[in-house]
């Protein structure tokens, strides 16, 4: 999931 990446550009963050 993108939220678990160092750089997040998703709505979930």
From Swiss-Prot:
Keyword hit for Protease: no
Entry keyword set: Disulfide bond, Hydroxylation, Secreted, Toxin
Tissues of expression: Expressed by the venom duct.
Cysteines joined through disulfide linkages: 2-12, 3-10, 8-13
Localization per record: Secreted
Modified-residue entries (4-hydroxyproline), positions: 11
Gene Ontology molecular function: toxin activity
Recorded domain comment: The cysteine framework is III (CC-C-C-CC).
The family this protein is said to belong to: Belongs to the conotoxin M superfamily.
Protein name as it appears in the record: Conotoxin Reg12g
